[in-house]
């Protein structure tokens, strides 16, 4: 009875929601036009940046050293910290920002890549009549619209499908999604809609067909998170903020307030991580925007302060692009343990995640095999049984730490806030914590408002609504065509440059090397499967990239797309960076080692490679073992029991295939488990066993050897009696 009432109530609410949405559609269209006009007006009110290009890191450090006192010093170069710096500097405040690692090196680069209002939070707001959750959704939807407007090259609307497997869920979820559209109002990207079972399968052919009723499609935003964070920091630098990465805060400076006699935070002792040099940076106001490390800085101010951050780890995996449609994501609203899983196309790959597990705060979070397998199992539940979801198809994996917080001023100290908290300590340290990527701008605005009030700073109102981020102002969807026409770039590379750098893509194109081919004329790729080119390494240094890890993970996104491809590109990236930054051989070796450790531990290479180790079980039929042994011995002509690069080169030359030595080294290195420069028979059999089981998606060596064997077999001499007679 209760169930029937619930369903009837849902349908009644659905009817009301439909009438309301239809009735307000014309009004929403009118309001959207007004909002667009407001964006134009806001952009016109903001003065041009002080610098056409961001100053060099060396120039920024000199500014930090030589400025007697800043108005605001921001600690933390993630999305929120960079947003605070941009908000402060565009209000006319003398602003500095320091980050102990690279911009976006923490949580801000390890997100689900969505700019969303939070459908789940709206559900909680309605079910629990929670006004705070409603306000959070309303704010996030406004910020979503703003972010899509100010960085159109880095973001775009994305349709997300919600498959429905029980008939009563259709009106239930439809009402919820329509309310999501309604709350968005003039900020609604596109109206949600219902799909029949057949239409849903047209869009997503791999979807589980059994018991599928239909689907609901709604719209949220998607972005390139690390590049977005970098664009915010670079925009702040262009407007005059002294921003420096690899600048660690060692301690907070304090001085006695002559009026109250109390100690006040007055700056920070900073250390250049790259040189070891230490110096003081003084400021009227210090802002702690360090995400998961919030309490570390708070304890520098007061060692007895109560911790407010409750870190939670969210793991994501990347799979080949064929696992999802190119232009539509999928949402599993209720996993086996009550979590939500997204399945999204991104950069021609597929992202699946996330988990939500309590964790310790660390600079180097590692994705666990347990979390990776949990996500794979949830993916299997939603895909057709005809599709084999294999562990070996995980191309990269990462863990990001969410800085969930409790409000120190709240009576309920155990209640975790999904919203942000701005706290001012007795000594004047301002802490901004919590929140989410989408609302970084409003979080920054709230923080600077609090700073202006608490420290009597002379500043204008916030000017960041409608303020274009670097690369966004003169971007257009057809900009890539000019890159192809003017510079002779491949279309795929040109599209990538336009979507990564916006109107700054022309500067990257100018740096591109000549290929020596008829086409493309310029743009030498770092790895053949991805559109990243060597010129991006040189340009990345202008964007404050200081290490090889910066380049493979945040200037390019190779590490987040395919760890093996990133590892292959590393030697060339280090060589190019070494030329620009005058690295000696020792420094180059150090960079290679550090970057490989990063890929191995933090980006899932460890989990991926552990699927094939020296202890891997060889589970092959005797006939298979025999076949693979014969293939192996065609290369090991001297019966040594192993093959080297020379053996492979000899066989390839005999069938007329040319391959450069560096590529061959990379191919052998994938299978050389004990790293002795030789691939032994047992290593090769382990590889073939792992490929058959689906633990490893494939191997270039395995494909190469099979192709060579087939070509060699074709060259067997024809018997005389079958040669049409006669010699």
From Swiss-Prot:
Main location: mitochondrion
Residues recorded with modification Phosphotyrosine: 601
Bridged cysteine pairs (disulfide): none
Catalytic activity field: a quinone + sn-glycerol 3-phosphate = dihydroxyacetone phosphate + a quinol
The keyword Transit peptide appears for this protein: yes
Family, per entry: Belongs to the FAD-dependent glycerol-3-phosphate dehydrogenase family.
Location of the EF-hand domain: 623-658, 659-694
4Fe-4S found in the keyword field: no
Broad class of enzyme this protein falls into: oxidoreductase
Record-linked PROSITE patterns: EF_HAND_1, EF_HAND_2, FAD_G3PDH_1, FAD_G3PDH_2
Subcellular location: Mitochondrion
Function text: Calcium-responsive mitochondrial glycerol-3-phosphate dehydrogenase which seems to be a key component of the pancreatic beta-cell glucose-sensing device.
FT transit peptide: 1-42
Record protein name field: Glycerol-3-phosphate dehydrogenase, mitochondrial
Pathway membership: Polyol metabolism; glycerol degradation via glycerol kinase pathway; glycerone phosphate from sn-glycerol 3-phosphate (aerobic route): step 1/1
């Amino acid at each position: 009875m209760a169930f029937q009432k619930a369903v009837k109530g849902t349908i009644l609410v659905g009817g009301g929601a439909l009438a309301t949405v239809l009735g307000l559609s014309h009004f929403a269209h009118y309001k959207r036009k007004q909002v667009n006009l407001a964006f134009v007006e806001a952009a016109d009110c903001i003065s041009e940046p002080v610098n056409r290009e961001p100053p060099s890191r060396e120039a920024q450090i000199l500014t930090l050293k030589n400025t007697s006192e800043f108005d605001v010093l921001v600690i933390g170069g993630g999305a929120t910290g960079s947003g605070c710096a941009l908000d402060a500097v565009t209000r006319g405040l003398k602003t500095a920002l320091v980050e102990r690692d690279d911009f976006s090196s923490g949580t801000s680069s390890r997100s689900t890549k969505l700019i969303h209002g939070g459908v789940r939070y709206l559900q909680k707001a309605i079910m629990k009549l929670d006004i705070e959750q409603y306000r959070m959704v309303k704010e996030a939807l406004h910020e979503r619209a703003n972010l899509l407007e100010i960085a159109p090259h880095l973001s775009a609307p994305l349709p997300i499908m919600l498959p429905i497997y029980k008939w009563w869920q259709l009106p239930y979820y439809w009402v919820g999604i329509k309310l999501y559209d309604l709350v968005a109002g003039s900020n609604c990207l596109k109206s949600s809609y219902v799909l029949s079972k057949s239409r849903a399968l047209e869009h997503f052919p791999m979807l589980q067909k059994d018991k599928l009723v239909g689907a609901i499609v709604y719209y949220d935003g998607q972005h390139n998170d690390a590049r977005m964070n970098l664009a915010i920091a670079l925009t702040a630098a262009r407007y005059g903020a002294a921003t420096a990465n690899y600048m660690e805060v060692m301690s907070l400076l304090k001085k006695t307030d002559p009026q109250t006699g109390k100690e006040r935070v007055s700056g920070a002792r900073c250390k250049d991580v790259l040189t070891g040099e230490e110096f003081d940076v003084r400021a009227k106001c210090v802002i702690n925007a360090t995400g998961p490390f919030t309490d570390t800085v708070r304890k520098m101010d007061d060692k007895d302060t109560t911790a407010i951050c409750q870190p939670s780890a969210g793991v994501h995996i990347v799979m080949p692009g064929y696992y999802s449609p190119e232009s539509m994501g999928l949402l599993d609203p209720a996993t086996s343990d009550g979590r939500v899983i997204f399945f999204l196309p991104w950069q021609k790959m597929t992202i699946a995640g996330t988990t939500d597990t309590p964790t310790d705060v660390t600079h180097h979070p590692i994705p666990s095999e347990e979390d990776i397998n949990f996500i794979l199992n949830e993916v299997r539940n939603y895909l057709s049984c005809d599709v084999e979801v294999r562990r070996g198809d995980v191309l990269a994996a990462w863990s990001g730490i969410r800085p969930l917080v409790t409000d120190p001023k709240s009576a309920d100290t155990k209640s975790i806030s999904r919203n942000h908290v701005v706290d001012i300590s007795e000594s004047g340290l301002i802490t901004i914590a919590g929140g989410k990527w989408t609302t970084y701008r409003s979080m920054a605005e709230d923080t600077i408002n609090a700073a202006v009030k608490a420290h009597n700073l002379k500043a204008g109102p916030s000017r960041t609504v409608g303020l274009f981020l670097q690369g966004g102002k003169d971007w257009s969807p057809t900009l890539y065509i000019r890159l192809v026409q003017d510079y002779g770039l491949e279309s795929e590379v040109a599209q990538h440059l336009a979507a990564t750098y916006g109107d700054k893509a022309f500067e990257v194109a100018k740096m591109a090397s000549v290929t020596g081919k008829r086409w493309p004329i310029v743009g030498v790729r770092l790895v053949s499967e991805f559109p990243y080119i060597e010129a991006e390494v040189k340009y990345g240094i202008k964007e404050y990239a200081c290490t090889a890890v910066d380049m493979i993970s945040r200037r390019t996104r190779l590490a987040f797309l395919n760890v093996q491809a990133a590892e292959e590109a590393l030697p060339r990236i280090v060589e190019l960076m070494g030329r620009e930054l005058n690295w000696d051989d020792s420094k180059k070796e150090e960079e290679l080692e550090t970057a490989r450790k990063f890929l191995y531990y933090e980006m899932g290479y460890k989990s991926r490679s552990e699927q094939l180790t020296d202890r891997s079980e060889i589970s092959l039929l005797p006939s298979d073992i025999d076949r693979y042994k014969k293939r192996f011995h065609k290369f090991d002509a001297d019966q040594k029991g192993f093959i080297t690069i020379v053996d492979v080169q000899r066989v390839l030359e005999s069938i007329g295939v040319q391959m450069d030595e560096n590529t061959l080294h990379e191919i052998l290195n994938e299978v050389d488990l004990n790293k002795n420069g030789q691939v032994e028979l047992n290593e090769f059999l382990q590889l073939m066993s792992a490929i058959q089981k689906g633990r490893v998606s494939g191997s270039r060596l395995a494909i190469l050897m099979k192709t060579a064997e087939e070509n060699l077999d074709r060259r067997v001499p024809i018997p005389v009696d079958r040669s049409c007679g006669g010699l």
